A protein has these predicted regions:
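Active-site-proximal beta-alpha loop/turn segments in soluble metabolic enzymes
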Residues: 150, 185-195, 228-233
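Secondary-structure boundary elements
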Residues: 174-181, 206-221, 254-255
Length: 256
């Protein structure tokens, strides 16, 4: 029988796999309160969001068209004349507004809303999610896709935002609509997917070695080994037999 990875250990495994192990101490996880993956991810996300809200959500300028008194920004003369607003001293202008209602915060907000629909989350954790949602400023809920998350994670983000977005991505990847239950979602246990867990463990192993073994092994990388070109492979060359190419999970090398 396959042994389950302890919940707290899984959180450390994921943080190393995502390359954000330096953020581990910023979000505390109580293993005794997290007896399931959906509860674990919910707890990590609302604790992370509480931290983001305290330090201030990411803000950016967004191009908007607004009706204003006088002129501000770039005047849209055609729309102003067409609407007749100028007769009352008002205009329609295109302005840049500094706002927290930006894509990355929309993804986080929408993920919190998604968690509220997942069956199996404990009521005390659901209450914390509800409390965290109430703290958010006006942010639009959006449809989150794998493509959108992938593009956001390619940006230069702070380590903490990178952690939060990876949690969001895992939640969206692991939820499906429940059959015959309108609006409710089922959480899929990704630890039962051997291929997915192999990928996670490979990334964990690589990043763990890079961070903790550099002093003794300066070079940490993956390596392709072509047995056909090795002395052992040459023995089979004349027979026409092919040997496989192997890719290591991680190779540690000390040139000394």
């Amino acid at each position: 029988m396959q042994q389950k990875i302890p919940i707290e250990n899984l959180y450390y495994l994921l943080c190393y796999a995502w390359g954000v192990s330096d953020q581990l101490d910023k979000v505390k996880v109580d293993g005794e309160k997290c007896h399931s993956l959906e509860n674990l991810l919910s707890m990590v996300l609302f604790n992370a969001c509480d931290r983001l809200l305290r330090q201030g959500l990411l803000r950016a300028y967004r191009f908007e068209e607004q009706e204003v008194e006088g002129v501000r920004g770039k005047l849209n003369l055609a729309e102003t004349l067409k609407s007749g607003k100028h007769l009352n001293g008002r205009t329609i202008c295109q302005v840049d507004e500094l706002t927290q209602d930006v894509v990355i915060n929309r993804v986080i907000f929408s993920t919190l809303k998604r968690l509220m629909r997942i069956e199996g989350i404990d009521e005390d954790i659901r209450a914390r999610l509800r409390k965290t949602l109430a703290k958010f400023p006006h942010i639009e809920e959006i449809r989150v896709t794998e493509g959108l998350l992938g593009r956001l994670l390619q940006h230069r983000l702070s380590g903490f935002y990178k952690l939060v977005l990876n949690i969001c991505r895992l939640i969206w990847d692991s939820t499906l609509p429940c059959k015959d239950k309108d609006g409710r979602l089922e959480f899929l246990d990704f630890t039962e997917d051997d291929f997915r867990m192999n990928c996670i463990f490979e990334r964990f192993l690589m990043n763990f070695c890079k961070q903790n073994c550099r002093d003794e092994y300066p070079e940490v990388h993956r390596e392709y080994i072509d047995f056909q070109l090795s002395p052992f492979g040459m023995m089979f060359k004349e027979t026409g037999e092919a040997l496989p190419m192997m890719e290591t999970d991680v190779t540690l090398f000390n040139p000394n």
